[in-house]
Each structure stands twice: as structure tokens, then as C-alpha cells.
């Protein structure tokens, strides 16, 4: 059965977050998530594992999750069925407060999106603006070469002085080196070789 073309806030809140299948909701519109390539999946898994391995036992406490629902602020719109915004980022790093789809955005320290041919425009424009407006401190975008066969670079964005826009902190080539919220060095080879 096909989902309705729009999803209201009330319908979303009345159901379990994972009951709608592979969709995102943008201003109430249902947007289907496309199946990803094997390389995309490999990079997401390896990067999430590297981030988990970078957590320090002494803290601070961070959780690393992949493809979990994150509800962003509702759109400013007078129609109740055009407001809901739910994304499933490839990877999130958040504090250890209990997970709640409606408030988790306030606990996220870093979001990572791994681009694909079907998500490139959204990952590099729309989501970058949305995540910054939500006040998420860091955003990484993993890019592939023109053949989509290997990682070419990772753009690292951090909030600017306003706390509402991202600026490029670094463009990583050959290795991702992070100092916050976790200290991590991961070569592109480690993230993508079978």
C-alpha cells in the first residue's frame, strides 16, 4: 500500500517512527529514500564504527547511530499537514540522553551524510541549511569521485558566529581528521576498501 502523499504531524506522532518505511518527510511531503550502493553502505558502516571506536571510556558520553529518525522543527505554515520535517541522516553523533524522535535534534553534535547520485543536491544544499538552522554544531559531507567509485573528499562544516549557518572548517583529502566532538583519524582507504 502506497503511503499518502502527505503526512500530518498528528499521524506521525500516533505511529512508531519506523512504521512508515524508507521515507523522509519534508514540509509534510513524503519523499522516498532510494536504495543506496554497496560502497555508500560500506562507507556509512565503517565511518560509524570508527566514530564508535573513538569514544573515550572516561567520557563525555556519545552515541553513534545510523539511519535513525530525527524530527526537525516544523515548517512555518498555516496548514497542519504541510509542517512535518523528519530526516534519516546517514550517521549522527549525539549525547547519551534518552532517544526521542521529537527532541533528539537538540542532542546531536554531528551529522554525516554520504552523498549518492540521488541525494547529492539535497545533501549539499537543503540538508546543510536545515541542520545549521537546527543548531547542530557539525556537519560532514562525504563526496565521491565523478565515477562514484571512491571517496574524493569530506567537507567539514561548523556553525558560524550566528549559530544558524555553516562555514567550511576543512576539506579533507585522503583522510578524515576530526577533533570534535570525537578525536578521529580515518583514512579514506580504511573507509572504502572491501
Task: Tell where the protein language model's regions lie, with residue ranges.
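Gly/Pro/Ser/Thr-rich low-complexity, intrinsically disordered segments predominantly at protein N-termini
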Residues: 1-194
